[in-house]
Amino acid sequence: MKKDGSSGSFGIKASPGSLSRAVSWINFSSLSRQTKRLFRSDGELSVCGHQVEADDENWIYRTQPRKAVSNLDEESRWTVHYTAPWHQQENVFLPATRPPCVEDLHRQAKLNLKSVLRECDKLRQDGCRSSQYYSQGPTFAAGSSPCDDYQDEDTEADRKCSLSSSEEERFIGIRRPKTPTSGDFSDLHTQTNWTKSLPLPTPEEKTRQQAQTVQADVVPINITASATGQDDDGSAHSLYVPDHYSTLGRLDSYRSTGQCLETRDTSCQTEDVKVIPPSMRRIRAHKGVGVAAQMSHLSGSSGNMSVLSDSAGVVFPSRLSNDTGFHSLPRTGPRASTYSLEGRMGALGSTEDTDDTSPYQGGSLQGHENFAHLGGASSTGMLSRPKSQQLRFLESPACVVSPHAAYSTSVIPNATLLSSSEVIVIHTAQSAGQLDSRTPGSSSYSKIKPRDRPTPRCSVKDDHQSPRHHWNEGHLIHSRALASSVPGATTLLSLHDSEVSLNAPANRENGSQAILYHCRNNPSFPDHPSDVDGKSECSYSGDRGCGSSEPWEYKTSSNGRASPLKPHLATPGCSTPTSNVSSCSLDQTSLKGDTRSLCSEDHDGYYTTTHEAGNLYTLSDGLGNPRHSMVNVFDGRAQRSQGDQAAHQDKILSRNISLKKAKKPPLPPSRTDSLRRIPKKNNQTNGQVLNESLIASLQHSLQLSLPGKGGSSPSQSPCSDFEEPWLPRSRSQSIVSEGSSLTSTTTPNVYSLCGVTPSQSDTSSVKSEYTDPWGYYIDYTSLQEDPGNPTGGCSANTEAATGNGPVRHIQEGSRVPVPQVPGCSVRPKIASPEKSQRVTSPSSGYSSQSNTPTALTPVPVFLKSMSPANGKGKAKPKVPERKSSLISSMSISSSSTSLSSNTSTEGSGTMKKLDTTLASALAPPPPPLPPLPSPCLADKSPFLPPPPPLADCSEGSPLPPSPMFPPPPPEALVPFCSPTDGCLSPSPTAVSPSLPRSLPPVPAPPPFLPSSEPPPAPPLDPKLMKENRPFFKNSSQSESSREALRRPANKEEGCRPPMPLITTEALQMVQLRPVRKNSGAGAVLFSEPSAQEQRTPTAPQYHLKPSAFLKSRNSINEMESESQAASVTSSLPMPAKSQSQGDHDSAVERGGLPSCSDGAPGPGPSLRTTLLPDSSPSRKPPPISKKPKLFLVVPPPQRDFTAEPTENGSEAFPGVPSPTRAEGEAVRSQEEKSSPASRAGSHATAPTPGSPALEPGTAGSLSSSIVEANVPMVQPNTSPGPTQEESGENSVDGERNAKSCLSQQGREAGLLEPNTAASSSDPVDVSKEEGSDEVLTPTKPRTTEDLFAAIHRSKRKVLGRKDSEDDHTRNHSPSPPVTPTSAAPNLASPKQVGSIQRSIKKSTTSSDNFKALLLKKGSRSDTSARMSAAEMLKSTDPRFQRSRSEPSADSPDSPSSCSPNKNRRAQEEWAKNEGLMPRSLSFSGPRYSRSRTPPSAASSRYSMRNRIQSSPMTVISEGEGEPAEPADNKARRALDATRVCSLDRLTGQEMDQASLLCSEEPASVDGIGRAEGNGPSEQCGGTEQKS
């Protein structure tokens, strides 16, 4: 019937529809009247429908005998007034005297005007119509039909102001019911005219319609089955959606455009137009499949595709079947289809299945079969939705949930539904009953039910028809069984609701598990083309086409989510997530992936999606609780299936989140999408088998909070793999568009991720809080590690990048283990760092910044993070990253850091390699670092994918995870560090293979030193650990904790995963206790132990150390510095100097300011010696390489410092200042000299020579270089050969960091103040002495100073400390110690100058808060002014700028300017050299990290401050001298004139970096605020969070 109506009436209407739309402005009145007529009398409509159609088609501007009221009539009056000859002539235009042609023209003009007016009025919806002003009735020449009476009627009505407004409303009201009623659907076909004719409903109208439509739609849901005929049309239409991958906006368009869009989406406007007639029906479609579904479809091109595309597909079939209920079907159906679900399940499943399926079957049912087979994703092109709906109503529970979830959470469910098609099929087995049962419980489930129903119907049919869809079949059977045993289904549904897959798993596990499992296995088994197809990333669409190709009408569609997302539709979740999920999840089980997407919503409270996912899980895993029940999820393959499902769920959740988010911020998802696409490409399906055991092991370990190296490690790889897809999933889901983009890229990964995801899902305990992210991440973590070993790298990165903060943690955490495991090798596969980065961005619960900041890498999804877990508001919001200071934050923080690390590190060129490296080894660390504020979370994340272990984060519990986590901390520590560290720490052993692989992607070995570093890295790591231990011993305060961390780290040192142990602890300690609790040195030391432990294991620990360090304010700078250092490290990892310094820096950062400094020297020399020879390229120091200069410069002194209590950084500093000054200068000179060598060779050779020289002066230099190390880290990161710059910039940045650290410590403990003061003079002298040596220093310090000033203020404000004291301590004490510490006068000079100037200005300035910043800026400017002409030239010289000046020029640039500049340049250079952007990562990382854990206390304040600082920093970067310091300004201007060129080039980068630093530093400064809420600071959050 619908087909007939649609085909007949609609076929006619297709033309009129477009015509009427084209002519709508002119024809609007007639359309309106027709619409009114349609609404007024359905009978008349039925009679007139075709006539109206004819009218529309034959739209003629008929002269309407009605009084032709035109201006000419009035003109005639005027003519009377003006009786001029021409006026008299005008009489010709009078109606009586006009020639017929003129009359026609007038009439047409009137009509057009009136039509336009009417249309405008309709749009106005205020009841007052412009047309009413014209008392002429609607001059719709459109009424050339028997409806002319109606035209007159309408005219009269139009004349009545109330009629147009009230009747229009009435129309709307009537229209809604008509739309929903299937009887009306006949009318709708008739009404298709009015739908065509009707203008899109105004928002109000839409809202009204939707409101009215919902109930009416409930009934039509049944008709979903009827949509078979339309389904075929839908197939064509469905194809349309695939084109809209980034249809998030389109999603909105769908929603806003609603009818029109849907029509277009259907591709077969005929059908869609038909649907369009009931504007509300369109809206209904939005509702049922509805906005969420459509969004999902649009964004995911999955659900929405289903809905929109599926207008032809599932939704459309449903709707078409239900003529009226097509749109309303998804809406009302899912909501009100509880009865429908069951009835439909039975009726549609059986009867309707046959009926609908028969038409559907012809073109769509087979597709549905494929759907079922392909998880409904395969044939989801357009069948996906139908399948979704048909299958779904077998799987109604999931489907229903999904639509609602899709609606509620996002369209994702629908998108998921596409995935859900398969998922639903899986669910159908268990979901049919479940959904039915659940449907009553939650309208949202009901909602999907209708769609589910059609899908299940199809599925049932398919199952019956095609054993080929064994899972579909089995699951269909299950569905039937479930339907039969609705009680159990209800329980399942209930559980599914809360834990979609918990109960369902039991149910499903029993009967359908094998099938679902089989399905899940299908990915493994070629048997399931869908799975197999899904497995193939892109193939999946094609494969899906293959799988569903037989039935798939849009086999064409199937070819690509590209063309029609129909296949994607089939894997709608894969589209965004659906394309990913489809590819991955759907790959696993087309169904599963989509289900995952679907299930994702589950967490959102739209357990519907989760339910689907859960059902999928259950089906695939037989694990009822994919999300919450980690253990179940870990069912080897089942787990992987579940993992996929979980990934899908998570993704869907994310996607739902993002879909929700997508409505408004779909764009970031788009970006994510782009990023994801890149990463998704890794088809991380391998390791499915491994996934089983590894996941099981991981699951156990995660659940037990044990290190579970075996499980953990596997978990990480899969986690990585999964994370990426997961992230995309989440993100993807959140960003349907992204999903569509990701579809191709993420698909394979998603598949892997999907497999892993369940693991995370299972880890639902943790996931409870971050249900979405954690569960999935954890799940997929364990799951994906093994299967995703190849994808692990990518996945790990993805995990790191995974939008869900928790997810990211888990991913990172999981990822960390991956490096330990062979997965490391696989990781390179995952090595698409972009993935990680991309994921990171989305993954970071902080999706916006993630996405936005990801200048380096399309931070894709951290919409997902934000959206993945983030976008979802539910899971992500659940994981308040900002609130997740500790545990919660841990996961989010980890995610954030990971995101930021991944994003920053992987940001660009580096991103890939870094991502690989990080994914392999470092990926895990980044999350911990970002979550530094929440080390537990971070720790738990990798080790304990399950969120609960996350809570475990205590030193003991996290330690096990920590081993995995240290790598994340490295990455988190700073993107710059993480690349190297990640590679080195986890990578050296496990990631070694991966790193090499990564390294190839990142050609420049220095950037990562992965290939060469990985093997040496372990030695380095142990050495670092051992060295760090002495270092830690120096910090007796943290000694025990350090030892604790160290021991686990050492224990796992060989494994590298132990690093995460430390990382977690370090993160926890640093973030929670040390940063906030420890006053200064205590906090620093505490952080240091954690970080050091982290570092002890290796760079990861080092990173963690920096995390701890970041805990101190220095940490933030270090983060930034480190991120740059990562780049530099990549460039200069080889240089012993760089390495040693890097290590030292790491130690310094680890120990806070002085503590780290002390600790670093011990490991520094050893590291230099050992690392240089042993793993010059690939030793942990490579990340340290970021701070290599410092390290090299500082190692011996650092040891000295180690001997001296680091806490008393000033002690060390005071003692060191003279050596620092003398040796610092020498060091700086050497470093500068060595810098070119480092630059040129980027090897330890050049740096090594410099290193010995540097070492002597480094003692003092490093003391202050603790911070310096941080800055140098940034600077080394900046350039392949930032050695010189490192020494100078390290000094500057280190000084800045040291200041930061010292002032932070001083602020916190006041310990460093005296010491700082004591060293202040020396540092000042050194700074002055070395200012000429390191002209770079002045500029850099200024920016650094500026940042610090801002940070100081922020922290002071947050902490309520006095500005003057803080400023003094920080500016003076920290700066001087830093200066002496940074034997390189570079740091001392810029910083000291800044310090001195600040001191002077301080005395002068009454308002320290405000003026301190200005003064700091001034000092920075002063520093830059002090830059020697040679240095200025260097900085200005483009050659120096990019190559040597990257470190060198940056150094001249103000610290902040330099750092960001350096970071940027480093990113650029790294991108050029390595293809990764450590700086970018670092850049992004700090931002994300910061945002991740935005200072709750002053979130707004921080964001404002950050922004303000960003602005000043930028200005400083540009001008190098802000108006703040007149004197300094002059010098700065002089310097700037020379440096302008370089700055201009670097300004953008610097601005970003500066803003990063600003954001980062304030957060760092606010040890408490930072950990508590770094939201605004998330830009720098990555860095700061570590702090």
UniProtKB/Swiss-Prot annotation:
Compositionally biased intervals (Pro residues): 923-934, 958-972, 998-1021
Q: Where is this region: Disordered?
A: 140-163, 176-202, 431-470, 549-584, 661-687, 705-767, 789-1059, 1083-1534, 1565-1587
Swiss-Prot/TrEMBL keywords: Phosphoprotein
Q: Where is the composition biased (Basic and acidic residues)?
A: 449-470, 1040-1055, 1222-1234, 1360-1370, 1434-1447
Q: Return the Low complexity bias intervals.
A: 705-720, 885-911, 1448-1460, 1484-1503
Q: Which Pfam families match?
A: NHS
- Phosphothreonine occurs at 1379
Biased region (Polar residues) positions are 179-196, 431-446, 573-584, 730-750, 757-767, 792-801, 838-855, 1089-1099, 1112-1141, 1275-1285, 1392-1409, 1576-1587
Q: PTM Phosphoserine: list the residues.
A: 24, 197, 328, 563, 629, 1079, 1157, 1218, 1373, 1375
* UniProt family annotation: Belongs to the NHS family.
Name it. Answer: NHS-like protein 1
Q: Which organism is it from?
A: Mus musculus (Mouse)
